Each structure stands twice: as C-alpha cells, then as structure tokens.
Amino acid sequence: MSEFIRKRIRELVDLINYHDYKYYVEDNPEISDYEYDMLYRELVELEKQYPEYVFPDSPTQRVGGKVKEGFKEVVHRVPLLSLSNVFNEGELYDFDRRLKELIGTSNFDYVVEYKIDGLSVALEYENGLFIRGATRGDGNVGEDVTENLKTIRSIPLRLKEDISIVVRGEVFMPKDEFIKLNQEREENEEPLFANPRNAAAGSLRQLDPKITAQRKLDIFVFNIQWCEKELETHAQALEFLKHLGFKVSPDYVVCRDIKEAFEAIKKIEEKRDLLPFEIDGAVVKLNQLRLRDVAGETAKSPRWAVAYKFPPEKKETKLLDIEVNVGRTGILTPTAILEPVRISGSVVSRATLHNMDYIRQKDIRIGDTVIVQKAAEIIPEVVEVVFSKRTGQERIFEMPKKCPVCGADVIKFEDEVAYRCTGVECPAKSYRLILHFVSRDAMDIAGMGEMVVKTLFEKGLIKTPADIYYLKFEDLVNLERFGVKSTNNLLKAIQASKNRPLDRLIYALGIRHIGQKAAKTLAEHISSIDDLFTITEEQLLCLPDFGEKMAKSVVTFFRQEQTRHLIERLKAAGVNTVSEKKAKSDILKGYTFVLTGALSKYSRNEAKEILESLGAKVTESVSKKTTAVIVGQDPGSKFTKAQQLGVKILNEEDFEKLVKALSREEAEKILME
C-alpha cells in the first residue's frame, strides 16, 4: 500500500510540474484550471497523510510557511557582472571596434536579446535539483532568496537532466501584474511602486514567501554561469537552457555583424510597447564562448557584451477632460482625457492622474497644456502643467458626489486620500468582490478560480456573490472549460459552501478594514448577520481590537439598501447567516494551544477552528503560558521547545478526546493526565 501511495504522489508531482511548464513557460495549457486544481488538491491531501513521501521538487514546496528574520549572504560561484551601456549607433560601433581589437579577429557573431528591466539572480542546481538562489548583490555576494524564488512557477524545481549547473536570470513583474498590484496598493492607500523593476525587487525580497507568491513574478534565464557540459556558442547555450526546462528570453537573434545587430536593436525598440514585460534596452553579446575568454572582463563588466539603452520620452499635449473610473474595490480614480499624442511608439489619449490630492498638488485643470510620460514606460501619466500656456479659461475639477457607474453615494474618510463608491452591486466593484468571496479564506468554493469567475461574469450569469447560489446545471454545462462532470463538481462545491461559519461569510463580503480576525470577532458577538444592520459605532468600538475605521466601515456597509438586498438573497438561497456561538460550548475557555506537525484527520485550519469554537485560544508560538502543544506527524521546533519548557504534549488521539469532552471537568481531566 505504501509503495502505491509513494508512486501516486510521484506521479502527481511529475504531472503537475509538467502542466506548470506548459502553462508558465510555454504559455500553452493542456488542461482546465479546475482539472489542475483537483490534481493539486489530491497531492496536498496525500502529502498531508504521508509526509514521509514529500519530494523536494513537489509543487507544494514552492511556498514555505515560515517568515524569515533576514536573508543570509551567499558568495557567488561565478561573479554576476553588470554590463557597460551605450546610447546610440556610434557608441555601439565603437564597442564593436574595441572587441575586434581585443580578440584579433572579425570572424564572429553577435546575439541580440531583450534587456529585461528586472532583478538579476543566480540559480544553482545539483544533480538536477534546485538547491539555492540568490540576488546579484554587489556581483560577488548576494542574498539567499531560495524560498521566494521557489514561488516563481516558471523556475523548475527539477531539471529535465540530472545535471549540476549555475544559471543567471532576470526576475521581473509582467506589465499587467504591475498595473494590478499598483491599483490594489492605491486602493489600500499603500505607497505605489515606481516601476515594474522596483515591484519585482520588493516582492522578491519579502521576508514572507507567501507575499512573494501572491505577486506573480516571472523569470527569463539568459546565461550559464557554470556547467559540467561544454558548449560552443551562446545561442547553443540558450537552446540547452530551454531543453532543461528554463524559460529563456524570446526572440533572440543571431547577427553576423554589428550592422545586423543594430538593425535587430531598432526592431526591438519598435515593438517595445507591445511586449507583455518591461525592457529598457537590448543586449548585444559575443556569440562564440571561447572568444569571450580572450576578450576578458574588467572588475565590473565583461568586454564581450554591452547594453544598448533606450531613452525615456515625454510629450506636451492638451488635457481635454477628466473622466472618473471606478476600481474593483470602489475607489474613484481620475483619468485625463488627452489630445492624442505619440509616446514611445504608441498613441496616448488617456493618462492617470492618480487621485484628487495629486490633482490639487500639481494644480491640474481641465484645458491645461500638460507634460505626459509613460510611468515605467507602461502607464501614461500627467507629470506637470505648462503654466506659461495657461489662458484663464481652464476649469478646476471636483470629484462627483454620486458614483458615475451605479449612482450610489461617494464617500471620503477624513484621514484617507481615496473617494469611494458605497454601492454593493456596482458593476465596477462586483468582479473583484466575487473573486474574494469564493477564495479559500472566505467561502472556499473549490473549482471556482479566476478563469471560471471571469467567464460567468462576462456571460452575465453572476453579477453579485449571491448569484453564485442561483446557478443551474444548464447555465454551466455548455460553457467553455465545462462538461457534465466539472459542472456537477462545481455545483456540489457551491452547495457545500452554504454551511460555512458566519465569520467566513462576513469576511467574504469584502467589508473595508474587516479581515479574518475582525470577522471572527463580529461573529462571536452577534446572533446572526441581521444584528449588523442595527449595530452602532459605539457598540463596535467596545469589541476587542476594533478601531474607529473598522467601526465606521461596518456601519456604512450595513446601512446600504444594496447590502440588505444581497443578504436577503443569500439567506433565501440557504447560505448560513446565523452565529454558531450559542450552539458551541466554552469548555476550553482560558486555555491556550499551539499546533505543530500534520494531523491525519484535520487540516491545521480545521483543528484551529474547532479549538476556537470551544473557547480556546490558538497561538503560533510556545511559551510558559501555553496550556498544551498538539503534535502531529513530522513536528517542528515548537515540539522541542514545549519539551524544554515542560508544556503538556497532546497527540491526535488526545486532541479528539479533548474536543469531544462533554464538560469542562472532563476537558480538565484530559489535560491533567
């Protein structure tokens, strides 16, 4: 039996890694999101039951759970040098002349590649397994970011050959992900990233790998730093990297001379704005590897390669009007409507104005002559006003008092920059809200990923979270990616979600400032969700850890007629809106527990919820105040610390006895044994 399980886990690991490669590297998926989710879920469950069979290249090992205190230093096996820059055709030809003098021949090729604007890293593999990854740092010493790099799905954890190799790549954030991230940060009043490079660097250097995983970074591998295999040319090396399973820079060109190389650079510049990732130039490299050794390098840069940098571009134009757009979380964003102007190869007729404070600070008015540039070469933005061309006919802009999409009230809290639509059913907000509603920490509807939600939303089958519970078999079965089996599975998952605890539903509603902890607090202090329609700010401020922003947000949300309508439809569909607090005992009130290792019958979250429902407190760290540590298979350092401190140890059998105890006295007896 155990050998069968081991083989099945290995089969799932290989299968999921294959589909990751097809999706993240080749951009050519072969299965639906739902089928992928089911494979992944099976693997997670098997690994939970049989932790001794967790393979190092398992896709579940991409996201670690531990938050680091800092990054260790790593000395690079081969220095990661930077490139010298050239800025025009003449300087490029000077580079070619110097290189020919250095190597004593003109009988060689160049390879021209994109200069990805990201963060350079080294990836080290031993016998085909990814063992270490580090940032460039100063070129000689970088930071160990192995766990964070594992979250990048285009980085293979196991190569297609059992080879030892060190490669260099550029981690970047795709343009669409950068835009999404900054929109989210703007809506949450967090500082914006200036460009995709900063976003990639900030994401990769997160101490918590789970945050890195959410940022959807990507990588292009562009060089072999060290390898057991002998290769003759750089082009050959790129093809070998592809063969091993790496994602390499697309559209590289082998050029016979510097003239062809410059033509290739011009073509790259022409299509720069059409690329899904950010580049700030092109790289020209000597193709013949043996001649690179002849050319050599300086302390900082190789003499056999150069970066051709593209210049930034700003243009003057007229601001014709200011249009207000509504984001997915309800924030109103002013957008400049411009007299069309060509910037960086594309016609720009709209540009961001960020927020009302930005407009006031820059004194931007409708009718002004303004300077526009592409922020990070992606997002057009108005950067300044040409005051010398102001005529006096310009108009001052003010934010609307009603949402331009749904007509609901627009509010602005005193301590915030953002203006917000309060409408629950505003179409501009609904899509993002639905994604949040179905997510794992909310209503946890299996198989309802982003592609499924997008399809249903675009078809008009769901406009609010409540619509999910009114979907019928005939609505789904003929849609793309659906069949009889997947339709039935999704409908079962939707049905199962109706019984989630009330705190899950409150969190799923996406109330501003109300996270999982606050949602649980609310659920513990009310009988049903109906109580929130009459609750006051004063009452909310009496709750543990509730501040003014949270109280105001809850009251505002539940005073909206659209909220009442949404809740009524959820109730009519059979979704649980009643608190479990009265049905639950408090036999473990005052006790504190810590969980470590894998339980065979319960996930970590399930065990935590059971204990909390009985009045217990569950913490992440062991101290002298801890009542007991519940230990599963393969426990961590918490088990050792509990033994050192003399804290009570409970196994899974003890845990089950404890949570089934009928009285506090019975629970105390179990804890005293």
Curated annotation (Swiss-Prot):
Positions with a binding annotation for NAD(+)? 33-37, 82-83, 113, 136, 170, 285, 309
Q: Which InterPro entries match?
A: BRCT_dom, BRCT_dom_sf, DisA/LigA_HHH, DNA_ligase, DNA_ligase_AS, DNA_ligase_CS, DNAligase_adenylation, DNAligase_N
Boundaries of each BRCT domain copy?
583-672
- Could you list this entry's UniProt keywords, alphabetically sorted: DNA damage, DNA repair, DNA replication, Ligase, Magnesium, Manganese, Metal-binding, NAD, Zinc
Gene Ontology MF, one = metal ion binding
Main enzyme class? ligase
Gene Ontology biological process terms in this record: DNA repair; DNA replication
Which residues of the sequence carry a binding annotation for Zn(2+)? 403, 406, 421, 426
Cofactor(s) recorded for this entry are: Mg(2+); Mn(2+)
Annotated NCBIfam families: dnlj, PRK07956.1
Q: Function, please?
A: DNA ligase that catalyzes the formation of phosphodiester linkages between 5'-phosphoryl and 3'-hydroxyl groups in double-stranded DNA using NAD as a coenzyme and as the energy source for the reaction. It is essential for DNA replication and repair of damaged DNA.
Q: Which family does it belong to?
A: Belongs to the NAD-dependent DNA ligase family. LigA subfamily.
Q: What name is this protein filed under?
A: DNA ligase
- Which organism does this record belong to? Caldicellulosiruptor bescii (strain ATCC BAA-1888 / DSM 6725 / KCTC 15123 / Z-1320) (Anaerocellum thermophilum)
